[in-house]
């Protein structure tokens, strides 16, 4: 499937599911009422059972129609979409779920086109009159057309589809649907399939029979659970270690996207989920299982909650059978696999991520259209197809890392791709969804991943964000860190001379490097000997490492009286000296400072300006020429 076709299919499926998913609560309410109060329910009640008919006939289709119209034409589109949907409902003798999916967007489209046509042409003072009457008149016309045309046409289409379904069920062909459903799920079409196709068919069948098998074709957690169990027993590396947690999230939380990377890293496992899905559907067909309403999310808890009286054995058996077959097939595939390196899910995830980036001419760290500049990033969104389970978990992992890194000015949230706001700075999506996200918000930077719980990617991103923030804060950080070392009483300019530059130094520890800088300040007549200890004491409080291979040691506020005159020494350590707790916090340039006023600001400004050019830092760290140092710092 080409990239454009896949994106179009995903977008269409997402549009269908977007009409249903916001209203899932209403479907669940209807399902619970049906399961409890109909004559065959748990608590039969003739009076309360009267809610069932009007809800499925009017409430649910109207909600879908309103939502579909709103997706296309905003609030006015929702109103006209609902009016149009009413025409479809009255024009047919069956629940109009498919009809509402046509009528709602049609109403939204028509009012949107009208609004665009009259934009700027309405005289002042007549806006409300035109808006109200246009919606009413267009809604009336569309309702009549829907009543006369769309309703009867959809009724005929629904009967044809129902006949096809009945034929498949009668001839035991329904399990073949898994051949298409399971691979489509891996392409993130699971919500589109479940809510865009199976839910409308299932609601109609449930209204007639009290339950529907369609609600468990895609939502059955068995096939995915079988794959994860196989990883737990026969997998290798971090894939085996992480499969247990993924299984809990998948089976109890209903987030099916969690197992997709495990299949993607070993594509042969698609066979396992297909056979598992077919087994589950076959079991449901034989034992007459099904649900009264969509199970969303597709967890075992939601499935049991939507199971009608008398269908528990069938549904549980279908889940167990699907899980068992998927597990056995996966185990056989694992045992016959000779590709050991693919057992590590993080390695596989990173490999696919890097290969996708490299195929587009980008570096692995810049998948999508990420630049090296993350300094402006303030809003990060982890996006998936529905904007719920998988992206919410990914956002949770990244948010904790960002918060732990102290990046309080960066927000991390999750969203559906279609709802990405225009002010987002960085978008993180699954690699199969990145192109859609890039079309939705082309101005943002984008990162692709294959596993929303890829801790390694989030850690790498956080480190880059920290480095970018440190780069911005360098000058402020220097000034703030030195506020306790000088007062602002003089304006004389301090000039860095050749006697203050020491190249080719070596030191085993930062204490040794700080002591040398302090001793040179003493020899230069800038400070009293006690100032050296004050520099060591200051380092114990917080590291004076600024990043970009630079450290700026100086004394404590109590030692300012030990400063005789402002002085700066430039010490070069080509092999580096570790200044921070992290292994990469290594300083090659150690700038010792003693100041009572702001005479040193010229040198500090030159240093912080140099941070903007990595080549300058590299030259300062490697040069053997004092004159070159002076030239670079006195630009």
Curated annotation (Swiss-Prot):
<feature type="modified residue" description="Phosphocysteine; by EIIA">
    <location>
        <position position="384"/>
    </location>
</feature>
<dbReference type="GO" id="GO:0005886">
    <property type="term" value="C:plasma membrane"/>
</dbReference>
<keyword id="KW-0598">Phosphotransferase system</keyword>
<keyword id="KW-0997">Cell inner membrane</keyword>
<keyword id="KW-1133">Transmembrane helix</keyword>
<keyword id="KW-1003">Cell membrane</keyword>
<dbReference type="Pfam" id="PF00359">
    <property type="entry name" value="PTS_EIIA_2"/>
</dbReference>
<feature type="transmembrane region" description="Helical">
    <location>
        <begin position="24"/>
        <end position="45"/>
    </location>
</feature>
<feature type="transmembrane region" description="Helical">
    <location>
        <begin position="313"/>
        <end position="334"/>
    </location>
</feature>
<dbReference type="InterPro" id="IPR050893">
    <property type="entry name" value="Sugar_PTS"/>
</dbReference>
<feature type="active site" description="Phosphocysteine intermediate; for EIIB activity">
    <location>
        <position position="384"/>
    </location>
</feature>
<dbReference type="GO" id="GO:0016301">
    <property type="term" value="F:kinase activity"/>
</dbReference>
<dbReference type="InterPro" id="IPR013011">
    <property type="entry name" value="PTS_EIIB_2"/>
</dbReference>
<dbReference type="GO" id="GO:0009401">
    <property type="term" value="P:phosphoenolpyruvate-dependent sugar phosphotransferase system"/>
</dbReference>
<keyword id="KW-0597">Phosphoprotein</keyword>
<dbReference type="InterPro" id="IPR002178">
    <property type="entry name" value="PTS_EIIA_type-2_dom"/>
</dbReference>
<keyword id="KW-0418">Kinase</keyword>
<feature type="modified residue" description="Phosphohistidine; by HPr">
    <location>
        <position position="554"/>
    </location>
</feature>
<keyword id="KW-0472">Membrane</keyword>
<dbReference type="InterPro" id="IPR016152">
    <property type="entry name" value="PTrfase/Anion_transptr"/>
</dbReference>
<dbReference type="InterPro" id="IPR013014">
    <property type="entry name" value="PTS_EIIC_2"/>
</dbReference>
<dbReference type="GO" id="GO:0022872">
    <property type="term" value="F:protein-N(PI)-phosphohistidine-mannitol phosphotransferase system transmembrane transporter activity"/>
</dbReference>
<feature type="domain" description="PTS EIIB type-2">
    <location>
        <begin position="378"/>
        <end position="473"/>
    </location>
</feature>
<feature type="transmembrane region" description="Helical">
    <location>
        <begin position="165"/>
        <end position="185"/>
    </location>
</feature>
<dbReference type="InterPro" id="IPR003352">
    <property type="entry name" value="PTS_EIIC"/>
</dbReference>
<feature type="transmembrane region" description="Helical">
    <location>
        <begin position="273"/>
        <end position="292"/>
    </location>
</feature>
<comment type="function">
    <text>The phosphoenolpyruvate-dependent sugar phosphotransferase system (sugar PTS), a major carbohydrate active transport system, catalyzes the phosphorylation of incoming sugar substrates concomitantly with their translocation across the cell membrane. This system is involved in D-mannitol transport.</text>
</comment>
<dbReference type="Pfam" id="PF02302">
    <property type="entry name" value="PTS_IIB"/>
</dbReference>
<keyword id="KW-0813">Transport</keyword>
<feature type="active site" description="Tele-phosphohistidine intermediate; for EIIA activity">
    <location>
        <position position="554"/>
    </location>
</feature>
<comment type="subunit">
    <text>Homodimer.</text>
</comment>
<feature type="domain" description="PTS EIIC type-2">
    <location>
        <begin position="12"/>
        <end position="342"/>
    </location>
</feature>
<feature type="transmembrane region" description="Helical">
    <location>
        <begin position="134"/>
        <end position="155"/>
    </location>
</feature>
<dbReference type="InterPro" id="IPR003501">
    <property type="entry name" value="PTS_EIIB_2/3"/>
</dbReference>
<dbReference type="GO" id="GO:0090563">
    <property type="term" value="F:protein-phosphocysteine-sugar phosphotransferase activity"/>
</dbReference>
<feature type="transmembrane region" description="Helical">
    <location>
        <begin position="50"/>
        <end position="70"/>
    </location>
</feature>
<protein>
    <recommendedName>
        <fullName>PTS system mannitol-specific EIICBA component</fullName>
        <ecNumber>2.7.1.197</ecNumber>
    </recommendedName>
</protein>
<dbReference type="InterPro" id="IPR029503">
    <property type="entry name" value="PTS_EIIB_mannitol"/>
</dbReference>
<keyword id="KW-0808">Transferase</keyword>
<dbReference type="Pfam" id="PF02378">
    <property type="entry name" value="PTS_EIIC"/>
</dbReference>
<dbReference type="InterPro" id="IPR004718">
    <property type="entry name" value="PTS_IIC_mtl"/>
</dbReference>
<feature type="site" description="Stabilizes the transition state in the phosphoryl transfer from HPr to EIIA">
    <location>
        <position position="538"/>
    </location>
</feature>
């Amino acid at each position: 499937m080409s990239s454009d076709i896949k994106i179009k299919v995903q977008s269409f499926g997402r549009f269908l599911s977007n009409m249903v998913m916001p209203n899932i609560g209403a479907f669940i309410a209807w399902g619970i009422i049906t399961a409890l109060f109909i004559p065959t329910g748990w608590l039969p009640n003739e009076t309360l059972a009267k809610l069932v008919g009007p809800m499925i006939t009017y409430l649910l289709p109207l909600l879908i129609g309103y939502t579909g119209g709103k997706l296309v034409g905003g609030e006015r589109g929702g109103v006209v979409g609902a009016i149009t949907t009413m025409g479809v409902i009255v024009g047919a003798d069956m629940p109009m779920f498919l009809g509402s999916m046509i009528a709602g967007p049609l109403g939204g489209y028509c009012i949107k086109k009208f609004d665009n046509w009259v934009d700027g042409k309405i005289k002042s003072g007549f806006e409300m009159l035109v808006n109200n009457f246009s919606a009413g008149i267009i809604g009336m016309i569309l309702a009549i057309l829907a009543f006369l045309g769309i309703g009867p046409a959809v009724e005929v289409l629904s009967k044809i589809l129902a006949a096809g379904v009945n034929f498949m069920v009668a001839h035991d062909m329904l399990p073949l649907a898994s051949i298409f459903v399971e691979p489509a799920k891996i392409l993130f079409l699971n919500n589109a399939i479940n809510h865009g196709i199976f839910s409308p068919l299932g609601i109609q069948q449930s209204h007639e029979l009290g339950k529907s098998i369609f609600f468990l074709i895609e939502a059955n957690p068995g096939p995915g659970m079988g794959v994860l169990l196989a990883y737990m027993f026969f997998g290798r590396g971090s894939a085996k270690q992480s499969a247990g947690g993924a299984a809990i999230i998948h089976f109890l939380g209903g987030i099916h996207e969690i197992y997709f990377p495990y299949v993607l890293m070993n594509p042969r496992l698609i066979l396992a989920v297909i056979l598992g899905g077919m087994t589950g559907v076959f079991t449901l067909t034989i034992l007459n299982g099904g649900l009264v309403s969509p199970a969303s999310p597709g967890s075992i808890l939601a499935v049991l909650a939507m199971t009608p009286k008398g269908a528990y054995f069938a549904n549980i058996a279908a889940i167990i059978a699907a899980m068992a077959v998927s597990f056995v097939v996966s185990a056989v595939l694992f045992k016959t696999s000779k590709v050991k390196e693919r057992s590590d899910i993080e390695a596989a995830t990173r490999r696919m991520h890097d290969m996708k980036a490299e195929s587009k001419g980008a570096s692995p760290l810049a998948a999508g259209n990420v630049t090296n500049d993350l300094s402006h990033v303030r809003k990060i969104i982890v996006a998936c197809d529905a904007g719920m389970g998988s992206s919410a978990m990914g956002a949770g992992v990244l948010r904790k890392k960002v918060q732990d890194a102290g990046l309080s000015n960066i927000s991390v949230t999750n969203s559906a791709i279609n709802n990405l706001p225009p002010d987002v700075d960085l978008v993180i999506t699954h690699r199969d969804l990145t192109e859609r996200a890039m079309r939705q918000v082309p101005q943002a930077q984008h990162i692709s991943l294959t596993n929303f719980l890829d801790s390694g990617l989030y850690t790498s991103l956080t480190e880059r964000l920290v480095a970018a923030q440190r780069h911005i804060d360098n000058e402020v950080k220097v000034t703030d860190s030195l506020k306790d070392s000088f007062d602002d009483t003089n304006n004389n300019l301090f000039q860095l001379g050749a006697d203050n530059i020491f190249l080719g130094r070596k030191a085993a520890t930062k204490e040794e490097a700080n002591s040398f800088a302090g001793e040179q300040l003493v020899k230069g007549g800038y400070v009293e000997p006690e100032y050296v200890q004050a520099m060591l004491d200051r380092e114990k409080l917080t590291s004076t490492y600024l990043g970009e291979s630079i450290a700026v040691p100086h004394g404590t506020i109590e030692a300012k009286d030990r400063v005789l005159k402002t002085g700066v020494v430039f010490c070069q350590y080509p092999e580096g000296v570790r200044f921070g707790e992290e292994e990469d916090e290594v300083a090659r340039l150690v700038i010792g400072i003693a100041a009572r006023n702001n005479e040193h600001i010229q040198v500090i400004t030159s240093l912080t300006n140099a941070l903007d050019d990595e080549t300058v830092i590299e030259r300062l760290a490697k040069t053997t020429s004092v004159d070159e140092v002076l030239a670079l710092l006195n630009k």
